[in-house]
Curated annotation (Swiss-Prot):
This is Zinc finger protein 131. A motif (Nuclear localization signal 1) lies at residues 137-148. Ubiquitously expressed. Predominant expression is found in the developing central nervous system with strongest signals in the forebrain, midbrain, and hindbrain areas and in the neural tube. A zinc finger (C2H2-type) spans 261-283, 288-311, 328-350, 356-381, 392-414, 420-443. May be involved in transcriptional regulation as a repressor of ESR1/ER-alpha signaling. Plays a role during development and organogenesis as well as in the function of the adult central nervous system. The modification Phosphoserine is found at residue 231. The gene is Znf131. Residues 574-587, 595-612 have a biased composition (Basic and acidic residues).
Length: 619
């Protein structure tokens, strides 16, 4: 027992805390074990979540709600002030020069709720205010006339038991001002318009503002003599004063008054009412509860974001909020969107569409925001400096790339997106080279043959525009039609590359996507309709007429003849052996008019015409 009692007396090592803090600061500067990146005015600060949460109530609450955020952008705080607060957090040293810089750091510390930094600033202000008052009292006696209780302007103070009287200084330029009853209101308006309230500090609890205090002072001033005269003997010239229509403006300054807005629950004070109002939300007992997972949030915006992200399928959003909104569902990954613009941008990940082009290097992008970021760093653009090589740095792992394509492919590793889609076996890949390797190994496709083919319903192309076409299945060939791409092989038929605006129309999914054969897969639709059959033919009708009409007639004729050459004799003979009543009527009509048409062209045109009448036309 005696041995145990002797071991209870341990020696303390106060330097241990400083050593731990110094090592954490070294790790921050060397970017080791940092798990959060803070963006302030475009500048990135690396830090540790645990250290920030220990020094700031703001970060403590934020990291509780958002635990997986690698990047956090902070608005309303200057870069200079945040750098001082980060240095204070890791070194316990606050090195500030000037009152303006100290004021910015004070506001940032209040916003981030860093109490220790606020205490350090209060100590600094007390040390600097005492010698400052002694030095300025003797110098300003000849220039400024202080207003005492016996004069017309009465000295006022905020309602507080322990606060000292507020000293109001009136600065007047050369000359004499006579204030009469008729002109006192105009003088009050000009004085209130030019007043400068430098510091508002108060120890008591009050919701009154500085403007209310000035109004009270003005009312007591009006209770004095109706006509007063201030001679130039009472004060010296002041260059700060401005003359408006022959009347010198009197500027009132409230010096070193403490914060007006005071929280009675935690004894904190704020200069701005907005910060005070946001702070009071932390004491509110009202919370927003998720009815599905019982998670609670202090702010309504965080609650709504939680519902939209995690419980949209379960009906997390109320019926009132969903009224009038149309849900857009991606047919590739089943992701849901409320806004069609977001849905349209998401589809470009699957289609590979890049409508935004850089005018300098002609590189294309899927989003306009990405193009703007690219323009600021484009080597030949406005944002680049001469003689400097363009580099792209990853903010997550600090990897550097010379080309935008390499940087973009690298970002997929962090986001986890798989934008490259194999339409043959419905597999997704992160990198484009992975998709090309898969096509070569699994499907033996090394190169895609792309040909444009347009077929007409009738043979006289000069009089009728091309509005429909028929494609006969051929293994390993891709037919690219105007605004429509059809890929055909022995296993399936895939229709791709269609304008995504039509995907919002429910008729597309109802009338075209259902009831298709299992071996036929339709990915997109474009200004028209599609009919698929069990046989070896795929009919695509009612294509974009304006795009087809832009082609020369000679090109349309050549494409027509080229496509007819690909027809196999078996299909042609099968169509000739199985004519229907409509075919017989058409033959009699053409014989009467003396038209001579090839059998293959005629049977194919008739087949297309029958298919056109079987489906309604999408608008």
């Amino acid at each position: 027992m005696e041995a145990e009692e002797t071991m209870e007396c341990l020696q303390e090592f106060p330097e241990h805390h400083k050593m731990i803090l110094d090592r954490l600061n070294e790790q921050r500067e060397q970017d080791r074990f940092t798990d959060i990146t803070l963006i302030v005015d475009g500048h990135h600060f690396k830090a540790h979540k645990a250290v920030l949460a220990a020094c700031s109530k703001f970060f403590y609450k934020f990291f509780q709600e958002f635990t997986q955020e690698p990047l956090v952008e902070i608005e309303g705080v200057s870069k200079m002030a945040f750098r001082h607060l980060i240095e204070f957090t890791y070194t316990a040293k606050l090195m500030i020069q000037g009152e303006e810089e100290a004021n910015d750091v004070w506001k940032a510390a209040e916003f981030l709720q860093m109490l220790e930094a606020i205490k350090a600033l209060e100590v600094r202000n007390k040390e600097n205010s005492a010698p400052l008052e002694e030095n300025t009292t003797g110098k300003n006696e000849a220039k400024k006339r202080k207003i005492a209780e016996t004069s017309n302007v009465i000295t006022e103070s905020l309602p507080s038991a322990e606060s000292e009287p507020v000293e109001i200084e009136v600065e007047i330029a050369e000359g004499t001002i006579e204030v009469e009853d008729e002109g006192i209101e105009a003088l009050e308006e000009m004085a209130s318009a030019k007043q400068s309230i430098k510091y508002i500090q108060s120890t008591g609890s009050s919701d009154d503002s500085a403007l209310a205090l000035l109004a009270d002072i003005t009312s007591k001033y009006r209770q004095g003599e109706s006509k007063g005269q201030i001679s130039e003997d009472d004060c010296a010239s002041d260059p700060i004063s401005k003359q408006v229509e022959g009347i010198e403006i009197v500027e009132l300054q409230l010096s070193h008054v403490k914060d007006l807005f005071h929280c009675e629950k935690c004894n904190r004070s704020f200069k701005l009412f907005y910060h005070f109002k946001e702070h009071m939300k932390s004491h509110s007992t009202e919370s927003f509860k998720c009815e599905i997972c019982n998670k609670r949030y202090l702010r309504e915006s965080a609650w709504k974001q939680h519902l939209n992200c995690y419980h949209l399928e379960e009906g997390g959003v109320s019926k009132k909020q969903r009224t009038g909104k149309k849900i857009h569902i991606c047919q590739y990954c089943d992701k849901q969107f409320d806004h069609f613009g977001h849905f349209k941008e998401h589809l470009r990940k699957h289609t590979g569409e890049k409508p935004f082009e850089c005018s300098n290097c002609h590189e294309r992008f899927a989003r306009n925001s990405t193009l703007k970021c690219h323009l600021t760093a484009c080597q030949t653009g406005v944002g680049a400096k001469k003689g400097r090589k363009k580099l792209y740095e990853c903010q997550v792992c600090n990897s550097v790339f010379n080309s935008w394509d390499q940087f973009k492919d690298h970002l997929v590793i962090h986001t986890g997106d798989k934008p490259n889609h194999c339409t043959l076996c419905d597999l997704w890949f992160m990198q484009g080279n992975e998709l090309r390797r898969h096509l070569s190994d699994a499907h033996n496709i090394s190169e895609r043959i792309v040909t444009e083919e347009v077929l007409s319903v009738e043979t006289h192309l000069q009089t009728e525009p091309v509005t429909s076409m028929t494609i006969i299945e051929q293994v390993g060939k891709v037919h690219v039609l105007p605004l429509l791409q059809v890929q055909v092989d022995s296993a399936q038929v895939t229709v791709e590359q269609v304008h995504p605006d039509l995907l919002q129309d429910s008729q597309v999914h109802d009338s075209q996507m259902t009831g298709l054969p299992e071996q036929v897969q339709v990915s997109y639709l474009e200004v028209g309709r599609i009919q698929t059959e069990e046989g070896t033919e795929v009919h695509v009708e009612e294509l974009h007429v304006e795009r087809v009409n832009q082609m020369p007639v000679e090109v349309q004729t050549e494409l027509l003849e080229a496509d007819l050459d690909h027809m196999t004799p078996e299909i042609m003979s099968q169509e000739e052996r199985e004519p229907n009543h409509a075919d017989a009527a058409m033959e009699e009509h053409e014989d009467a008019e003396g038209l001579e048409t090839k059998p293959s062209e005629y049977s194919q045109a008739r087949k297309t015409e029958n298919d056109r009448t079987s489906l309604p036309v999408l608008e």
